């Protein structure tokens, strides 16, 4: 699976999208992740409702399912900032993420879990039978187990995708919190991928693939082991069951991201060109053929035998649509240059302008 994921990663790295399109894709991906990750935990909201809740203005009171999806979205934004700062995996990061996931919940649900009242067993119960599905480690073992996980993440030579799978498994299994363990595990597993260059530009939702078959997700993470942590889950005999499942989901997700970004790239160029009139397209074509560096409206107007004002007006449209950028000197535009977007997509833009011309001349 890793070879195929690497191939998809390489394909995605060659795709260049405008800032506007990339931001839109990232936001939609975060919404999908917020929907899917909470769906795994039994959140009843539909994808449409999740979208509406995230887009709605901040208000004082939310229903619990609404608060949960907003919290997940906020946590994704928070981790995006941390990736940009290259922040290491740490206990503080784990606690901060869980605090965001449980924002609005009662105090005892935030932070590491403590002792239970005498005679009460802390366990994850089957909602239908009432029997314990999973009995996590004792609360007093949690700090040491987290320290071991953090040391592993920051010192191992394992492939980053294996590390992400281990973080996911261990945070669900150590179950350090009263609530929010699964969501925190999925967020921080994604963070490890992002931090190591496997975030696929923040596009697509890995959580979506876990949510497609929730039973398979839980069966893979449980690996057929007894309910008690100390009866095998602390050191699973066949970790490859979970690792293979995790990598298969990443492979499917990375393939979808490839398709999504390649399709978006074509739409992005065509969309930007659709705002240009014939003369503006001709000017863009001329600039791409004749200028590698800076140029001024006056020199372009002389070469094209049109007025300076006409060129300035056409350049304003090219600037607005991201093809050209103005160079300011003392807050005044002195010259222009082709944008990075234009240079990255020069061949495709030329082809699209050319095919558009041929169609209109029939």
Regions inferred by a protein language model and the residue ranges of each:
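FIC/Doc superfamily catalytic core
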Residues: 1-362
């Amino acid at each position: 699976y890793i070879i195929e994921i690497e191939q998809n990663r390489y394909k995605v790295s060659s795709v260049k999208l405008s800032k506007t399109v990339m931001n839109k894709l990232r936001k939609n991906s975060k919404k999908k992740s917020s929907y899917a990750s909470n769906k795994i935990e039994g959140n009843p909201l539909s994808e449409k409702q999740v979208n509406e809740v995230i887009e709605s203005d901040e208000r004082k009171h939310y229903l619990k399912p609404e608060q949960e999806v907003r919290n997940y979205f906020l946590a994704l934004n928070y981790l995006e900032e941390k990736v940009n700062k290259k922040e290491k995996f740490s206990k503080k990061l784990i606690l901060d993420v869980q605090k965001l996931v449980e924002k609005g919940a009662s105090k005892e649900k935030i932070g590491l879990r403590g002792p239970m009242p005498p005679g009460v067993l802390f366990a994850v119960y089957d909602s239908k039978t009432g029997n314990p599905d999973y009995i996590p480690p004792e609360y007093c073992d949690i700090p040491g187990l987290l320290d071991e996980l953090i040391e592993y993440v920051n010192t191992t030579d394992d492939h980053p995708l294996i590390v992400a799978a281990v973080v996911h498994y261990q945070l669900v299994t150590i179950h350090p919190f009263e609530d929010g363990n699964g969501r925190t595990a999925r967020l921080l597993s994604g963070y490890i991928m992002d931090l190591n260059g496997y975030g696929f530009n923040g596009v697509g939702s890995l959580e979506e693939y876990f949510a497609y078959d929730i039973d398979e997700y839980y069966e893979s993470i449980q690996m057929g082991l007894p309910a008690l942590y100390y009866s095998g889950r602390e050191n699973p005999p066949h970790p490859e069951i979970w690792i293979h499942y995790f990598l298969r989901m990443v492979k499917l997700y990375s393939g979808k991201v490839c398709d999504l970004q390649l399709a978006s790239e074509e739409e992005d160029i065509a969309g930007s060109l659709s705002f240009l009139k014939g003369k503006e397209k001709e000017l863009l074509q001329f600039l791409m053929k004749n200028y590698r560096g800076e140029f001024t409206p006056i020199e372009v107007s002389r070469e094209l035998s049109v007025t300076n004002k006409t060129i300035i007006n056409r350049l304003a449209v090219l600037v607005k649509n991201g093809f050209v950028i103005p160079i300011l000197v003392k807050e005044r535009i002195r010259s222009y240059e082709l944008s990075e977007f234009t240079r990255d997509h020069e061949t495709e833009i030329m082809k699209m302008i050319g095919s558009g011309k041929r169609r209109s001349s029939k």
